[in-house]
């Protein structure tokens, strides 16, 4: 163990997803070796994220405004909603350049063992968006793009059951091709784009 502030920095870095003890130590000593202005830029970026980032009131993705740039864009197709688990999944789908509709971020996936049920996700908000129309336009399709793992499949199954009550609504799921057990954010653009364009109706 290192002394005082150095060990504190390593401990805090080690709490980040995907950062183990050795990586935390390597990052900490990198930060100790850089010039003060670089540290200041990192500190300011963290401060701006803490103070200026919020969640879009419509779709739930991260934004620096009340409405994210996608929800505020009148050119996006309001009749199609792509449902994803996390804001990072929005960026994964956007990179494909295949989807021109809007998104809905659930904020996770169903995981009873971790205490995550329907009430902990933004499912009620999704149903309200469809039931109340999207800016006065009927939603015609919901694409379920949850991760291809146990929790994602359970979430997709639950959503299909909830969405069946809406007459005329098409519910689809990304086509096979994504590796089972993986995360949407790690899929390459080509594979994810093909899964999106080849989606199957449920």
Curated annotation (Swiss-Prot):
C4-type zinc finger span: 56-71
Keyword DNA repair: yes
Gene3D superfamilies: 3.30.60.80, 3.40.1360.10, 6.10.250.240, RecR Domain 1
Classification via Pfam families: RecR_C (PF21175), RecR_HhH (PF21176), RecR_ZnF (PF02132), Toprim_4 (PF13662)
Gene Ontology terms: biological process: DNA recombination; DNA repair
Keywords, in A-Z order: DNA damage, DNA recombination, DNA repair, Metal-binding, Zinc, Zinc-finger
GO MF annotations in UniProt: DNA binding; zinc ion binding
Keyword Endoplasmic reticulum: no
InterPro entries membership: DNA_Rcmb_RecR, Rcmb_RecR, Rcmb_RecR_Znf, TOPRIM_dom, TOPRIM_RecR
Domain Toprim: 79-179
Family: Belongs to the RecR family.
Job of this protein: May play a role in DNA repair. It seems to be involved in an RecBC-independent recombinational process of DNA repair. It may act with RecF and RecO.
Protein name as it appears in the record: Recombination protein RecR
Species per Swiss-Prot/TrEMBL record: Rhodococcus jostii (strain RHA1)
